[in-house]
Amino acid sequence: MPTVEKSVSLKSYNTFAVDVSAQYFAEVCTPEDIRSVLADPRYGQLPRFVLGGGSNTLFTKDFEGIMLHMNGGTIEVTDENDRFYFVKVSAGIVWDDFVRHAIESGWYGIENLAAIPGTVGGAAVQNIGAYGVEVAEHIVEVECFDPDRRAMRVLSAEDLSLIHI
């Protein structure tokens, strides 16, 4: 199980550098990390907040609960054909690092989304976009952890309803 810290300052975890604290804080990378933290009776029933890069989060007060900070992970090609690469990317990967990796690997299509702050998980949730490109155009499905069922769940791009208004 990842280490769970108590009374952690969130100042370095948000781009506004707001100095508030989380009652409990854990760095997580995998679904197993999340599952193990939430399976612990000390943390499983607490309010929870999943934090990525902190670039679209404005804290206004201390968080009373367990803060799960998505951090790191893997980038893996799961399939490919004549036109596409199918890539599984962990939510905690820094978005710009993934874009750079994609360009260096010859996986084109998301290069217009370079230099957008945050993580891959946040990119999918927010449908980041720039210069006529939206990340939704490149998502087939998202695998996510359902904390209530404590199980993985796969959502199709249609299930996500990723649109910009």
What feature does the model see in each segment?
Residues V154-S161:
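A short, charged helix-loop
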Residues P2-H138, V142, D146-D148:
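Anion-binding (especially nucleotide phosphate/pyrophosphate-binding) glycine-rich loop
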Residues I163-I165:
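Conserved small/polar residues in nucleotide/adenosyl-binding loops
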